[in-house]
Amino acid sequence: MELYSHQEKALKKMHNGCILVGGVGSGKSITSLAYYFNKVCGGKDKRMDPKKKRDLYIITTARKRDSHEWEGDMAHFLLSPDPTASPHGVKVVVDSWNNIGKYENVENSFFIFDEQRVVGYGAWSKSFIKISKVNQWILLSATPGDTWSDYIPVLIANGFYKNKTQFTREHIIFARFAKYPKIDRYINTDKLSRLRASILVPMKFERETILHKTFITAGRNEAMYQDCVRGIWDPFKNEPCVNAASACYVLRKIVNTDPTRRTIIRKLMAEHKRAIIFYNFTYELEILRDIMNEAQIEYGEWNGEKHQPVPKTDRWTYLVQYTAGAEGWNCIDTDTIIFYSLNYSYKIMTQAAGRIDRLNTPFKDLFYYYLAAPGIDQNIRRALNNKKKFNEEDFYNEEFIPF
């Protein structure tokens, strides 16, 4: 298997406990398998060193597991979850993060943790730390961490800290008068920077694709919007908004259901025969269904309830809910993504955009359309431009005027 030059460079730097960092579509999967085959198992000429070979466990998204995406890359190394198709005599397991707890007692194997989920200190992170103590492993990520706290599980797994308590004692200062534990700042960050540099293996490469990003201004019902802002009022339920989350939800529904968005989508679908459309809320999906049915455009869906494939017709749209489908799959049959509404998370937006920007895409030019209205959408966009997550509480405290 011949790798691209940027993958070869990364392979030489990889080591046990590292995070392979590559943009979406950079080929992290094939590079991680090359590391397992060549460095961990002493593979050469499609043969493993019998004394070095280890069973392989891949923890990935449910979608990647169910679509058998990993199996395509495994074939280059004669690896397969099917024992009859894997001549090396090693066990190969591909499963989702939801089931990581099932493998806490596995020892002397090699784990690839795909689409990093070990952020925070929940059940998945605790299972990951337990597995890391008795196995070799690497992590794959396009966006490894936004804050130092995101790195706690990986730093513990590498033996730099005994537990979260030690990390907190050495590096975190909490806000004095907060109602709940709130981080005010981090200290001794020089040490953290050195440790992070020792585990990150960047996979940099120059993309041949040209990205064309267009931000389209949608309208809003001004009267409804101002009534909500001034009175913290939900016009859909005719009752007060109970908190920042509900108030922001109402504002977003006001702008996302504005008729101008229908007009914009119809125009874009007239210009592009095939497109992926990302959305946040179920009411947006209902609007998009209506548009496609009216225009007689075939469409498929991927959300919490439906897992339909991408259509194979000449003209189609694929309606994808961010949480369900921002990562773990790709499509090289279209050059267009439309973001019907913006997601709060920079990480999710980046992952979503990468569904069409792959190494093997046949398109030179890729088109991205972002729909946004004045007001709350502008604030979300500002947070995304700063590579941060939109904060509803901050927006609520700044913008809303209660009676």
What is each PLM-predicted segment?
Residues E208-G300, G304:
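Conserved helicase/translocase motor-coupling segment
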Residues Y344-A353, D357-F403:
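A conserved SF2-helicase RecA2
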Residues K12-C18, S29-P50:
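Walker A/P-loop NTP-binding motif
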Residues K53-D55, F110, S127-R207, T361:
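Conserved P-loop NTPase motor "coupling/switch" region that bridges the ATPase
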Residues G22, G27-S29, I100-V106, G120-Y121, ...:
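SF2 helicase motor core recognition
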Residues R63-H88, N158-Y161:
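Conserved helix-turn-beta segment of the N-terminal RecA-like "Helicase ATP-binding" lobe
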Residues M1-L20:
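Conserved pre-motif I regulatory segment
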Residues T31-A34, D49-A75, D146-D150, F281-T282:
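Conserved Walker A/P-loop ATP-binding site and its immediately adjacent core
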